[in-house]
């Protein structure tokens, strides 16, 4: 459901963190808002915006955040077991378009992070172009950053859930 990571983060912090959930979709934010009310969570504020233009929208966001979760739009290849028809909409061109957007999001969002902060990049895909290869290229291009850790989960008999990827990135000390 839209916003499940935001509500989970609010619950993990006992509803005490300042969480700003950003999405371009008013419909998704409305669902999130409904879930926040149902769960009585007050620490999550929603912002309808294109995440690639947050600095232009609010310059105070520069070096503002301690932690950022970038749950990037992706091909969703890791969810094919739940969404088998989505395979018919996949193409090399679509993956290329998504990687360009993912890279733009990383470039746009990293300046919002405090110098001692941490960014978590996550996708629900198992496509290396959208995951480790993208992150390696991004860090190679941005010499002030370092990869703290990364994990690729592949669906299997031992793990029947979705495939996904996450990377933790921070500034070098």
What residue spans do the PLM features occupy?
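S-adenosylmethionine
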Residues: 1-173
